[in-house]
């Protein structure tokens, strides 16, 4: 291994160790000694890469921002229904948050006040959601009377709330939780002709793979429609209430 390779590995180890500390303790209570110890390096090695705690936090946030922007980019740049891409992006981000402590810590840091913050990740998420909903409106995918402005407020409140709740219980990020949210929202958001084709569990390679319409190759199984099924008690009534908020 070359000296440059070792330096890269050390820096990445420090970023991950810092993310673990920031996630568990927050920016103020995290300390550099614990970060260097967690990475298995000396304090001197840490200061070779980062001048101070704010610089370490900035590196964690930078890595998290890159991962989140990549996820958002998949939604913006992919083909197909804009509403389905919005669903897919939320599932992709949830998987990132479940799997990557750096992404979780980066979002927490971005919500805290500390010196050197240069980005607003929640604003970027808002713009992603608003952009996809505006595209959905332009393509005639939204139900009559549903506006991107009011819809984005509901989606943002729900997804941001899930992220905050998941800091204490990552079960909030599990696919069933997010799928239930979309089972509730999609019948209120989507034009009637599209509802059956949208998959609230996401349409990516790790998603359910079963469209809500229930059409499966070979007719072996049928997916339940959005807002129905034994695992979604009371959803039609709840969906009606949410629909009023969206209009």
Q: Residues of each region from the PLM?
A:
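Short, basic, alpha-helical segments at the C-terminal edge of helix-turn-helix-like DNA-binding modules
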Residues: 62-68
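Short amphipathic helical patch at the helix-1/turn junction of helix-turn-helix
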Residues: 26-27, 47
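DNA major-groove recognition helix of helix-turn-helix
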Residues: 50, 60-61
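Hydrophobic alpha-helical connector segments
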Residues: 59, 70-99, 114, 148, ...
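N-terminal intrinsically disordered/low-complexity leader segments
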Residues: 1-9, 168, 196-247
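Basic, helix-initiating cap at the start of DNA-binding domains
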Residues: 1-25, 32-38, 54-58, 77
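Short hydrophobic/aromatic patch on the recognition helix
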Residues: 39-50
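Hydrophobic/aromatic-rich alpha-helical bundle segments in the mid-to-C-terminal region
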Residues: 104-111, 115, 119, 126, ...
């Amino acid at each position: 291994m070359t000296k440059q390779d070792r330096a890269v590995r050390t820096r990445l180890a420090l970023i991950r160790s810092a993310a673990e500390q920031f996630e568990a303790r927050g920016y103020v209570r995290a300390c550099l000694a614990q970060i260097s110890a967690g990475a298995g390096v000396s304090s001197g090695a840490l200061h070779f890469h980062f001048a101070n705690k704010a610089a370490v936090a900035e590196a964690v946030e930078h890595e998290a921002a890159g991962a989140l922007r990549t996820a958002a980019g998949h939604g913006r740049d992919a083909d197909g229904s804009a509403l389905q891409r919005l669903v897919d992006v939320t599932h992709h981000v949830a998987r990132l948050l479940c799997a990557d402590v750096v992404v979780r810590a980066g979002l927490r840091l971005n919500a805290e006040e500390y010196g050197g913050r240069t980005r607003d990740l929640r604003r970027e998420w808002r713009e992603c959601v608003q952009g996809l909903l505006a595209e959905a409106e332009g393509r005639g995918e939204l139900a009559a009377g549903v506006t991107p402005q009011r819809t984005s407020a509901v989606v943002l409140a729900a997804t941001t709330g899930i992220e905050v709740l998941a800091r204490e219980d990552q079960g909030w990020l599990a696919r069933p939780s997010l799928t239930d949210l979309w089972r509730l929202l999609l019948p209120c958001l989507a034009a009637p002709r599209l509802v059956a084709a949208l998959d609230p569990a996401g349409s990516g390679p790790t998603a359910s793979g079963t469209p809500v319409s229930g059409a499966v190759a070979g007719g072996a199984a049928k997916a339940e429609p959005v807002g129905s099924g034994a695992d979604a008690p009371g959803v039609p009534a709840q969906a009606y209430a949410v629909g009023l908020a969206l209009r």
